[in-house]
Design a protein with these regions (language model features):
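Catalytic grooves of carbohydrate-active enzymes
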Residues: 180, 184-196, 200-223
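A cross-domain feature marking catalytic cores of carbohydrate-active enzymes
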Residues: 34-36, 61-64, 85-87, 136-138, ...
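Active-site beta->alpha N-cap acidic-glycine motif
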Residues: 3-94, 100, 104-114
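Charged helix-capping and loop-helix junction motifs
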Residues: 71-74, 98-105, 171-177, 202-206
Length: 223
């Protein structure tokens, strides 16, 4: 597994200040996010766990997965969670030319427009404009891609805590530790509702929801 940061370095936040890394808050609020779905069985399980604690979250969905499983995508929206674009084919921005990358985002948009309802954050009108959320797969974007994506009306959402549930070389306990040791008020935490991450997700998410709910935290979606 290639190296990655569990806690996003301050330098990254400074260099890419146009991206959202954390939502500053004096309140006890956390922002859970789930990438790469919708995935049959796993996304529904995630929704069930969130429902137990009346927790809201943000799901960054892959367009082709929405097309294959629209009923799961609609379930996310019906339960009043936020949704965001995660490209159509989980592209790596560093390995994709800007024109092709933007086209892939637009292809993904078509699924959002076809299957989303007015409850979807991505389609909510804000002062006459659409509020859109986007997260680049792998967190990788070029400066050119970033600039043009924002011109498309997207707010680029990153994170300040990476659970690393995708890493097959770490234990379930280490994944939980990654989250517990680094969370603070307003943290944006990354999980994945994918097959690859499912074992760690099912171990960690219930414990995070229980522990922080007991500590008086609320879980909100990103707007």
């Amino acid at each position: 597994m290639k190296p990655y940061f569990i806690k996003t370095p301050i330098l990254f936040k400074f260099l890419f200040s146009n991206w959202v890394w954390r939502l500053s808050s004096k309140e006890k609020v956390l922002y859970l996010t789930f990438d790469d779905g919708p995935t049959p069985g796993i996304t529904e399980w995630t929704l069930n766990e969130l429902r137990k604690y009346k927790a809201k979250a943000t799901f960054f969905c892959i367009g082709k997965n929405i097309g294959e499983h629209p009923e799961i995508f609609q379930k996310i929206i019906e339960e009043n969670h936020a949704v965001g674009n995660h490209t159509n084919n989980h592209l790596n921005g560093w390995k994709t030319k800007t024109a092709a990358y933007l086209q892939n985002i637009e292809e993904s948009e078509k699924y959002f427009e076809e299957y989303a309802t007015l409850k979807a954050v991505t389609l909510s009108a804000v002062e006459g404009q659409n509020l859109k959320l986007f997260r680049p797969p792998y967190g990788r974007l070029s400066f050119s891609q970033s600039k043009k994506i924002r011109k498309m009306g997207y707010k680029i959402i990153m994170w300040d805590v990476l659970s690393a549930d995708f890493d097959t070389e770490i234990s379930n306990e280490k994944c939980l530790e990654n989250v517990i040791r680094n969370i603070e008020n307003g943290s944006i935490i990354v999980f994945h509702d994918s097959i690859k991450a499912s074992e760690k997700l099912k171990f960690v998410l219930p414990k995070v929801l229980e522990y922080y709910s007991y500590q008086g935290f609320n879980f909100r979606s990103i707007e």
